[in-house]
Amino acid sequence: MTTYAIGDLQGCQTQLNDLLQKIDAVAPQAQLVFVGDIVNRGPRSLATLRQVRALGQRARIVLGNHDLNLLAIACGLRKPHASDTVDDIMAADDRDELIDWLRHQPLALARDNHLFVHAGVLPQWSAAQTVALSREVEAVLQGPDWVAFLQKMYGNEPSLWDDSLQGDDRLRCIVNALTRIRFCQADGRMDFKAVESLAHTPAGLMPWFDAPDRRSTDTTVVFGHWSTLGLMVLPNVIGLDTGCVWGGQLTAMNLTDRTTIQVKCPQHQKPGKN
C-alpha cells in the first residue's frame, strides 16, 4: 500500500484540498501520514482539522507543538497569541469533539521502517524507545488528568535526556524532543532558541539528526516543524516542512519511491514569527 507523508498544514486547508486531489489522481487508495501542526497560523484551522479527521482510517497524524498549543488554549490554560488563528475552532459547535479527537492522537508513529514525529528524536533514543516514550505522554494526554498535564508541560528544562527522569520532568523532556527540537549539542542537550537554516548553524550546535551515535539511524525518521530547513531528503531522514504558511509549498512524499507532490501556497505569515 502506497503511503504519502505530508508536511505541516498549519490551517492551510485550500492547499490541503489541492494536494489531496493531486495525490488521488495518481494513488487514490494511498494512506496518508501528517507530521503534525495541523492547525494555526493559516486562515482555515477549523476546516483543516475537520477535513483531516474526516479522512478516517485513511490518515494518521502525529501531534505538533501547535496542536498541543490548541489543546492548552481550548482548556483555558493559555491565551491565544496575536499570530494564532484558532478562534474559529474555539467558536465551533463541534469544538469539544474535535479537541477530544486531537488529544487522542500519538506523538510518534512507526510504520514500515519509518518513524514519524513532528520535530525530531534525541540521539539516545532508538526508534522503538521513541515510540515507547511517546506512549507515556499519550497515556496521560488521553487520560482524565490531561488538563493538569498540560499545565506542567511547558518549559525548556530538563533539556538533556536521562533514563532516570521521572514525573513531569520526564514527560516534558519527551514532549520537547518530539515537538520542538531543531538543534542540539553533541550530547543531545536540546536548544530552543535557534531556528535558522543549516547554513547558519550556531557554534556548538548541530541539527538533531547529525548528533553522533544517534540510535535511530536504522530507520527513516520523517518529520516537519523546521520550515527554514525546507525539504530534506537523506538516506534515513526526511524533512517535509516546506513553509506552506510562510508562502512556500505544501509537500507530500511517496515513501516507496520518494517522489514528491507539491502545492504552492500564499504567504499567510511573515518570517520571524516562530
Swiss-Prot record:
UniProt keyword list: Hydrolase
- UniProt xrefs under CDD domains: MPP_ApaH
Per its UniProt record, what SUPFAM superfamilies does this chain match?
Answer: Metallo-dependent phosphatases
Q: What's its job?
A: Hydrolyzes diadenosine 5',5'''-P1,P4-tetraphosphate to yield ADP.
Which of the seven top EC classes does this enzyme belong to? hydrolase
Molecular function as annotated in GO: bis(5'-nucleosyl)-tetraphosphatase (symmetrical) activity
Q: Name one Pfam family in it.
A: Metallophos
On the tree of life, the source organism's domain of life is Bacteria
- Belongs to which family? Belongs to the Ap4A hydrolase family.
EC annotation from Swiss-Prot or TrEMBL = 3.6.1.41
Q: What is this protein called?
A: Bis(5'-nucleosyl)-tetraphosphatase, symmetrical
Gene3D superfamilies under this entry? 3.60.21.10
- Catalyses which reaction? P(1),P(4)-bis(5'-adenosyl) tetraphosphate + H2O = 2 ADP + 2 H(+)
The reply to whether S-adenosyl-L-methionine figures as a keyword in the UniProt entry is no
Taxonomic lineage from the root: Bacteria, Pseudomonadati, Pseudomonadota, Betaproteobacteria, Burkholderiales
